[in-house]
Amino acid sequence: MFSITRTRRSRGFTLVELLVVLMILGLLAGLVGPRVLKYMGGAKTDTAQLQIEEFGAGLDLFHLEVGRYPTTDEGLVALTTAPTGVDNWNGPYLKKKDIPEDPWGNAYHYRAPGENGDYDLYSLGRDNSDGGEGEDADVVSW
């Protein structure tokens, strides 16, 4: 009875158009991707530096009240839990109850007395080994 006829044929994208779009997306990913990853790596280094500064403030408060910095054996845990035999401890000296790991999932290193000051507090960076460059560089308190 009624017949609907199409005057225009439906068309999809041609193979050439799809290849051009994929090529443009690949170029964008190649140009923008490394820059985004660079900023993400820098953010982890900045986070480690801020955490080290927060630990440093807690260590200074510990020193003011107790009269010394925590020993290497007491470590950073002395900022959240009173070490045995310490009478003037009025902590916790950090907002968090647990000592966080560095942004790369490794423990911070603490040594007192330090080689570079009253104490040394540092992260070994992404590679978790001494030295390095860029995101692998050590983040230190001195």
For each predicted feature, which ranges?
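Aliphatic-rich helix starts adjacent to a transmembrane/signal segment
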Residues: R35-E54
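N-terminal leader/signal peptides at the extreme start of proteins
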Residues: M1-F13
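Conserved amphipathic alpha-helical interaction elements at protein-protein interfaces in regulatory
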Residues: S10, G42, L61-E65
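Alpha-helix initiation/capping motif
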Residues: R8, G41, A48, R68-Y69
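Low-complexity, acidic interaction segments enriched in glycine
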Residues: Q49, E53, A57-W142
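N-terminal single-pass transmembrane signal-anchor helix
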Residues: S10-V36
